[in-house]
Amino acid sequence: MRQLLIIHFLFILFPIAAMSQETKVKLTEKVYITFPEKPDVRNMQEIASVYSLRLADSTANFNVVVQNLGKNGLTEEQIETAQLEPAFWEQLESSFIAQLGNETTVLSKEKKNISGKDVLILELSTERNGKKMELKSYIFIDSLYSINIVHSKRAAGASLDLRDKFFNSLKIVE
C-alpha cells in the first residue's frame, strides 16, 4: 500500500516538475519567447546569439537566432526603410531557404503583423541525411536585430501542440 501511495505521488508530481522546466528567454529588450525546456545558448562576439533545444526524444528541435545587423554597419533607419520593400522579405526568405539546401520546398508562407512587427512565417519541408523534416519559422526585425525562430519536426511523433505553444509564447513589447 505504501509503495502504491509513493508511486501515486510521483505521477502527480512528475507533470508539475515537467511544466516547471519551461524557460522564458529575453531575446532583445522588447522580445521574449518561452522554450519548453532550458535551451543551450551560444553568444558569438555580439554578432549573434543562438538558442537551441533538442527534445530528449529527438522528435523536434527549437531554435532561435538573433543577429545584430548593426555589426554589419546597418543603422536602424536603413533597416526600417528596407523592410518597406517586398525585395527585403524575398531576400530573407531565399537566404533562409538556401541555408537548408536544394531539397527544400515551401509548403506555405505569409506575412503577419504581430504586436506591430511584420513577421514572415514560413512552413517548409526539407531532407537531411536522408530523413524528411518539416520546419516552421518566424522571421522578423526588432530594431537592429534580425530574429529567426524555428521549430524542426524531426519525427512523426513530434507534438504540434508543443510547437504551437512555443510560437504562441512569442511576446513583443511595443
Task: Identify the role of each PLM range.
Residues 135-145:
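A short, solvent-exposed beta-edge/loop patch
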Residues 26-28, 34-36, 42, 54-56, ...:
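A structural detector for beta-sheet-dominated domains
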Residues 47-134:
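Conserved polar/disulfide-associated segments of primarily extracytoplasmic proteins
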Residues 1-23:
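Bacterial Sec-dependent N-terminal signal peptides
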Residues 18-32, 75-80, 173:
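Sec-dependent signal peptide cleavage junction
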Residues 23-24, 34-44, 96-112, 171-173:
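Short secondary-structure junctions
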Residues 21, 27, 37-39, 143-174:
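Surface-exposed amphipathic alpha-helical segments
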Residues 31, 35, 84, 88, ...:
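Stable alpha-helical elements in mature extracytoplasmic
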